[in-house]
A protein has these predicted regions:
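N-terminal and secondary-structure boundary signal
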Residues: 2-350
Length: 350
């Protein structure tokens, strides 16, 4: 039986995670992040050299707003979680969490309608297994695909622009097989299918974007909650780096402004965040199972700022002071950092 609770769940942060940095530590993190950027730049560089269609007189400019009309009948944020009773991962739990979260928000039919072309954006950035918690859980992805079909979608596409070699990432993450089994089209990044877009941002000006994200009717963001060496956490808005080609490591120089620019450009229909396993330390790549924590949770909603703020506080005790992109995004009217003021629907599964 699933217990229902309309109140905000108690938030606790892991004792082992430090949220405040000295200036020296911050500089060291920047240096380490530079190494990550260099290792990840292989994908970005090949895309930057070969990916962009011949330019028109000017770059395409389009804010991709896929939001649905707000309905006060439904919460803007929901949390579904299993009781942490000492049992390890159980078959079917990720699927049940997605189902409960969508039920709390009014069902997938509220977000996806007949004949929609839906693009699902998991995190498939790294050559890692599901147990390493560097990519979105494949069971989450498969269930979202099934829900889209049930809602009447015409096409369901699962894609991402990986940091490591894409074929290995899609395969080893388990996402390619799970998504295909659920009936989705799985699209790997193709250097011929990027389009230069004028994003009109402060840090992000003109940049190549993978075309499935420019042609969808609805876009569902499926990030995984992870530690990030540079920002402290990588959550929903950081997942939009995976729509870009080019030399993405350059964006780390103004990472918080870049994240706010991306959030203003790509406004998803719905965000469903995988917190089944989270990467508490040494993100975003991970690799050591000791850095992974089992939380058996999904957080979903229509306010991307509130969702990121909630998860950052819950697992890393980070707020908008530590994550400036949250305040930048809120100041642009993209959501609220004050998630405590929202009606949050929570469900405990057993």
């Amino acid at each position: 039986m699933a217990g229902e609770d309309e109140h905000l769940p108690q938030i606790k942060s892991p004792d082992s995670v430090t949220s405040r940095l000295t200036r020296r530590e911050a500089l060291l993190q920047l240096l380490r992040a530079g190494g990550i950027a260099a290792s990840a730049a292989g994908t970005g560089i090949w895309l930057s050299k070969r990916s962009v269609r011949p330019a028109a007189a000017s770059a395409q400019q389009a804010r991709k707003d896929h939001r649905i009309t707000a309905d006060q009948q439904w919460p803007q944020l929901t949390v579904a979680q299993y009781a942490m009773d000492g049992r390890g991962p159980q078959p079917g739990e990720p699927r049940a969490l997605v189902q409960k979260a969508l039920e709390n928000l009014g069902g997938m039919g509220r977000f996806v309608t007949h004949q929609d072309v839906v693009v699902i954006k998991p995190n498939i950035a790294w050559d890692r297994t599901p147990e390493q918690a560097a990519n979105t859980n494949p069971e989450f992805v498969a269930e979202v695909v099934r829900q889209c079909w049930q809602a009447g979608a015409r096409r369901v596409i699962v894609t991402d622009v990986s940091c490591n070699e894409a074929q290995r990432c899609f395969h080893r993450s388990g996402i390619e097989a799970a998504a295909r089994a659920a009936g989705a089209e799985v699209t790997l990044p193709d250097p011929e299918k990027f389009r230069e877009v004028d994003m009109g941002g402060v840090a992000l000006k003109s940049w190549p974007v993978f075309t499935p994200f420019l042609e969808a009717d609805k876009i569902l963001n499926l990030p995984i909650a992870k530690h990030h060496e540079l920002t402290g956490a990588t959550l929903g808005m950081k997942n939009w780096y995976g729509i870009l080609g080019g030399q993405r490591n350059r964006l780390h120089q103004q990472i918080h402004q870049s994240l706010a620019d991306l959030a203003a450009f790509m406004l998803p229909t719905l965000t469903i965040m995988d917190c089944y396993r989270i990467l508490l330390r040494n993100g975003p790549t991970g690799g050591n199972l000791e850095d992974v924590a089992l939380k058996k949770t999904v957080v979903a909603g229509t306010d991307p700022v509130a969702l990121d703020a909630y998860v950052a506080k819950a697992y890393w005790d980070l707020d908008a002071e530590h994550l400036p992109y949250l305040r930048l995004a809120a100041n642009r009217g993209l959501g609220t950092v004050e998630f405590e003021k929202l009606a949050i629907k929570t469900s405990q599964l057993s």
